[in-house]
């Protein structure tokens, strides 16, 4: 059996693609990847040899474009979907699995036009525009945030490094692979207070702010573990007892898998404010704290760091997500829906 995996644009979407690829391989399913020349798709998968083939199309986003721009992008997507149909025929694709993002549009529409099963995984609490549009036509729609909860695909390594936190000795600031300037500034401002409490700092600051952050810690004579990007983020998480992070869905569930208590600062300009609602999913269960970027008071924030019941939160985070989530999605999609596979 050969399937197409499509979608991406951001690390969160692409992390799910990688998990699905690894699960498909376990079941001897071959995968063709269809992504975009734009975004991070090529950086992630151009050299990924486990795909049967990879295609990076000139996909364009529709959101935030003018009326004319949206029409132009839609026509371009329809043209690319025709190219995808040819890919489906050449590689005998039997189903399409989309993780969303504009780069998923051509292959997703092509699946509908070709009468192929279309499976969609929505990573966020608020569905993206493409997924909302295609949901009624999908063979199966998966989401960890809906009433019919589906497992969220998280790499095993985040579970393997999990532990129950009991005492705050190390704190990790996660600005993402691209960095988050606000979180970087917050970390630098909190650094003297953390040093007074003998709390060590681990800081992912992104490439743009790396030198600035490094020099600032040196000027404070603080030995921080500072890095721009790491392919082994789970190793950094393993050493932390508390995280300060944005609330992208993949990051959120990786933190849950690692049972790492977190204070979330949602990115305020995320589409549909989805990062806030992602974090609220945990806050409603008393499993995290949320601070809004525009109203943070440094002293109050620091007090909240010291007050958290790490052991209680860490223990209960074990129940939020489960290992082998991608395996379960592949099983539900392709094997529990065999009547759809032609």
Swiss-Prot record:
Q: Which GO terms describe its molecular function?
A: UDP-N-acetyl-D-glucosamine:N-acetylmuramoyl-L-alanyl-D-glutamyl-meso-2,6-diaminopimelyl-D-alanyl-D-alanine-diphosphoundecaprenol 4-beta-N-acetylglucosaminlytransferase activity; undecaprenyldiphospho-muramoylpentapeptide beta-N-acetylglucosaminyltransferase activity
Q: Where in the cell is it found?
A: Cell inner membrane
Annotated GO biological processes are:
carbohydrate metabolic process; cell division; cell wall organization; lipid glycosylation; peptidoglycan biosynthetic process; regulation of cell shape
Give, as in the UniProt entry, the pathway in which the protein acts.
Cell wall biogenesis; peptidoglycan biosynthesis
EC number from the UniProt entry: 2.4.1.227
| UniProt keyword Membrane, yes or no | yes
The reply to whether Iron figures as a keyword in the UniProt entry is: no
What SUPFAM superfamilies has UniProt attached to this entry? UDP-Glycosyltransferase/glycogen phosphorylase (SSF53756)
Which EC class is this protein assigned?
transferase
What family is this protein classified in? Answer: Belongs to the glycosyltransferase 28 family. MurG subfamily.
Summarizing the function annotation, the protein's role is: Cell wall formation. Catalyzes the transfer of a GlcNAc subunit on undecaprenyl-pyrophosphoryl-MurNAc-pentapeptide (lipid intermediate I) to form undecaprenyl-pyrophosphoryl-MurNAc-(pentapeptide)GlcNAc (lipid intermediate II).
Mind telling me what this protein is named?
UDP-N-acetylglucosamine--N-acetylmuramyl-(pentapeptide) pyrophosphoryl-undecaprenol N-acetylglucosamine transferase
Q: Which organism is it from?
A: Campylobacter jejuni subsp. jejuni serotype O:6 (strain 81116 / NCTC 11828)
Q: What is this protein's gene name?
A: murG
């Amino acid at each position: 059996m050969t399937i197409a995996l499509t979608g991406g644009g951001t690390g969160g979407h692409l992390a799910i693609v990688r998990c699905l690829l690894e699960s498909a391989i376990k079941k001897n399913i071959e995968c063709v990847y269809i992504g975009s020349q734009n975004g991070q798709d090529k950086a992630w998968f151009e050299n990924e040899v486990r795909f049967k083939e990879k295609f990076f199309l000139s996909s364009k986003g529709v959101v935030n474009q003018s009326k004319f721009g949206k029409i132009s992008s839609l026509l371009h997507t329809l043209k690319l979907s025709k190219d995808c149909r040819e890919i489906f025929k050449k590689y005998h694709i039997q189903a399409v699995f989309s993780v969303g993002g504009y780069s998923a549009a051509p292959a997703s529409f092509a699946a509908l036009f070709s009468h192929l099963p279309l499976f969609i995984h929505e990573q966020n609490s608020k569905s993206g525009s493409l997924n909302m549009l295609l949901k009624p036509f999908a063979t199966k729609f998966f989401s960890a945030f809906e009433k019919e909860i589906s497992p969220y695909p998280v790499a095993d390594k985040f579970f393997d490094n999990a532990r129950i936190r009991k005492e705050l000795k190390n704190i990790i600031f996660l600005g993402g692979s691209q960095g988050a300037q606000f979180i970087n500034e917050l970390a630098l401002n909190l650094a003297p207070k953390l040093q007074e409490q003998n709390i060590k700092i681990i800081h992912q600051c992104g490439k743009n702010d790396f030198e600035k952050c490094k020099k600032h810690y040196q000027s404070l004579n603080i030995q921080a573990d500072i890095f721009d990007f790491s392919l082994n983020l789970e190793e950094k998480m393993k050493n932390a007892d508390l995280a300060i992070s944005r609330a992208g869905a993949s990051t959120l569930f990786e933190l849950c898998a690692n049972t790492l208590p977190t204070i979330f600062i949602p990115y305020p300009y995320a589409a549909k404010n989805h990062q806030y609602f992602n974090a609220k999913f945990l806050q409603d269960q008393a499993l995290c704290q949320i601070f809004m970027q525009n109203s943070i008071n440094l002293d109050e924030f620091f007090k909240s760091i010291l007050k958290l019941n790490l052991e209680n939160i860490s223990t209960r985070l074990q129940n939020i997500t489960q290992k082998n989530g991608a395996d379960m999605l592949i099983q539900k999609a392709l094997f529990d829906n065999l009547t759809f596979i032609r």
